[in-house]
Amino acid sequence: PSNGEQQSPQDCGAPPEEQDPESDLSEAQDEERQVEQALDDALEELEEEEEQYQRLRQEELLFQIKDEVEGMLTAHREQMEALVEADSGREQGGRVSRRTRITLRAIAREEEAVAARATKVADALEAEGVLVFHEIVRTVEGDLVRIVRDLGETGGYQSGARVQAMQQDVENALTWLQEALEEEMQRREEEQQEQEQEDQQQQDQQQQDQEEALVPDAAELRLLRKLEEDLLGRVQRLQDLHPELEDPEAELDPLLLEELTRMAYQHQRIGELFQQFRQRLGVPDPD
């Protein structure tokens, strides 16, 4: 270039203006906060989705169990009616006719199928840690196994009051279970509606703990109390029907002894369940 031309600083190779380090740090911190906020939002969304999934899974499981219990109850009631009819046609004190044996075997097969369904329901409840509901279904399963035995050759083709009473116990237990499941599903539905109306986003820890369980402790304890009251009533009725139980030297019928053993085991299990709830809830043992 000629001597008369002037060069700009850039043309002369002058260094560019330096940026403020504090400004760079501030921008980096802002970006970091934005990233952290985005991660927190994503995590919160995932937690909400997980809670929603668990709630829907439990509702579906409750519905399936309730549906299965209703099916068991319907099938069992049909066999109760069939047994009453079969027993009414028997000759008292006589040999069991071939026709009656065939009928009792058919009833036994159906009751055995109900017992198999009870096994699956009990396994599902046990996996969810539902103590009392699981115990009820296990008891139903055991009673049905005894009924099947008594209806067959091993049990002497029984069809009278004792077997029918055991069938009644099964019906009562399944009915209580059905009602308790309906109440729990209704409670969940009402709770969900209240949350939607209030636009409630968070629950305190106690509510969260309760929602994690398929059935809350309060519902289980109510059913456990009902079991205890029913057992006490059955024991009293058995004592009224068999005054010989008051005589320590009386020779008791083997079937009566089996019934007493059955009731004693149920009483033991109820006590053990109450103990488990005391430990779970941190309630001290009674003096």
Language-model features, listed with the residues they occupy:
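Mature extracytoplasmic or organellar-lumen-exposed domains after removal of signal/transit peptides
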Residues: P1-D287
